[in-house]
From Swiss-Prot:
Belongs to the UMP kinase family. One of its GO terms (biological process) is UDP biosynthetic process. The keyword Kinase applies. One of its GO terms (molecular function) is ATP binding. It catalyses: UMP + ATP = UDP + ADP. HAMAP family: PyrH_B. GO terms for cellular component: cytosol. Its EC number is 2.7.4.22. It comes from Stutzerimonas stutzeri (strain A1501). This is Uridylate kinase. It is found in: Cytoplasm. Pfam families: AA_kinase. ATP binds at residues 18-21, 61, 65, 168, 174, 177. InterPro entries: AceGlu_kinase-like_sf (IPR036393), Asp/Glu/Uridylate_kinase (IPR001048), Uridylate_kinase (IPR011817), Uridylate_kinase_bac (IPR015963).
Amino acid sequence: MAQQMSARNPRYKRILLKLSGEALMGSEDFGIDPKVLDRMALEVGQLVGIGVEVGLVIGGGNLFRGAALSAAGMDRVTGDHMGMLATVMNALAMRDALERSNIPALVMSAISMVGVTDHYDRRKAMRHLKSGEVVIFSAGTGNPFFTTDSAACLRAIEIQADVVLKATKVDGVYTADPFKDPNAEKFAELTYDEVLDRKLGVMDLTAICLCRDHSMPLRVFNMNKPGALLNIVLGGAEGTLIEESNE
């Protein structure tokens, strides 16, 4: 089976995978579930094994949510800086899981953390990607008021990724929340303008506009489905594809 997979040519040479911090919680209410980390590391390792270059951005919502404390009175900039640190913690945990699976990985941070991570450098990141290392981009964009979704799209554009893959707990984009509305229908494909016009909430406005303005395809899929990530990279139609209109 593994030989058959490696014989197939990947559809994408370089991807940017966006994971939510909540995805790392697994069945826990807070923090990081080591079993989830190990499973994700193996799935990423499958991609590296067939020659795909992988950039990673992980949210921090499993450890800290600046927006929630901001609503309770905390200074928004302070809260966002704390959220950036949470993403660094998740990135370090993911690097450890990858390296324990013998997958070389590098953590880069948008805020300087000498001795803990490398500082973000686009050219250096691309060199490491080309050498087969997984590069994990942490601390968002380094600026408050920007989400990790926006950071993922920005880094994807900077490293010239072929696609942004957004891992969620549902298998694509729906007309409504499928957990609340049993009649919600899934979209197979959408354009950026349709996402904006329908206010589907796939990502924040900044992230969607970045992808649209730079013709960066975006696919939303369920990371909890075994093999979904590999299937996408090999050309499978998992989840929902969002790209610019052909008109």
